[in-house]
Amino acid sequence: MVTSVEPIRLGARRSPLARAQVALVSAALAARGVPSTFVGVTTRGDVDSRPLSEIGGTGVFVGAVRDALRAGSIDVAVHSLKDLPTTPAEDLEVAAIPEREDTRDVLIGCRLADLRDGVRVGTGAPRRAMQLLDWAARAGIDLEVVPVRGNVDTRIARVSSGEVDAVVLAAAGLRRLGHLTEVDPAETDTVVSSLQAEILDYRVMLPAPGQGALALEISRSLSIDRRAAVAALDHPTARAESLAERGFLAALEAGCTAPVGTRVVVKSVRGTTLDLTLTAVIGRTLVSNLSEPPKADPVLRFEASGTSPKPWDFGVYQAGQVLSALPDPPRPRR
């Protein structure tokens, strides 16, 4: 328990989703007798409305929050893990990755079976656009993917207003905001804000590395008692799966907006050794030296399994397997 009477200051963006995520962390701390308070931070991604790929998507939602950590105005930064750059900050550390939310994506506005030629689907993520277009090509459908940004409610409103026919959003964010109610695991049809929706199967849409996970980042100089209070929220399985996914992404030298979808599952644990499976989909645009891919196969798919005591290293190794199998592996980006 934190011995100081001062509450732990939780810093995050001011968006409704960020606040909801802070509320979850605050409740988890309170359950352990640890008081906390919210400190809002405005990030570059909040004030620049351009597509993330244009403003340098890596870290645009976390830079200002990290600066607040370094300045000592907050004790803990509450991030969506997928937004964190894979390159670690030497003066900061992720003290906890709490239990992970649903890692799937949700199509809002219609079901996959309802998609037809000319349907406009909104997303701001190259990963989602890549997989949507790949699915549509295999289904013989000519979809139009429309770039959209904004918070969850803003993007849902674009469907209600008719600006787009559907949008794709993360199930985790929808659940944390109370927009997505529980459904039978065998069912994928649901309703979001009175709109028809479908929870997408992993065979259609793989998540971003770390999707659905929170990262509780602290300064390495944080006091021992506060560090311990935060570390108590760590979930070993969530950490292992997320680290493996992010190791895979890092080894591909891809930023967090790169067209890479990855899912790692811890199948079993034997002592300190983890039995892991990895499934990935990679946009060919990431592999710049690869010759023109066949039209029937616009993305690279990869599956692997193995054992390792170090999830990050497992992800790095599997990315190496992908790159070594390419006919002309790309040179590292400078």
Q: How would you name each of these model-derived features?
A:
Residues 19, 23, 58, 71, ...:
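Short, small/hydrophobic-residue-rich motifs at membrane-helix boundaries and re-entrant hairpins
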Residues 14, 62, 125-126, 171:
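Helix N-cap/beta->alpha junction signal
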Residues 2-42, 47-50, 54, 138-334:
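Small-molecule-sensing regulatory modules
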Residues 81-84, 88-143, 214, 223:
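A conserved helix-loop-strand patch within extracytoplasmic ligand-binding domains
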Residues 50-76:
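Short, structured active-site "lid" loops
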Residues 74-78, 165-166:
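Short, Asp-centered acidic motifs that coordinate Mg2+ and/or phosphate
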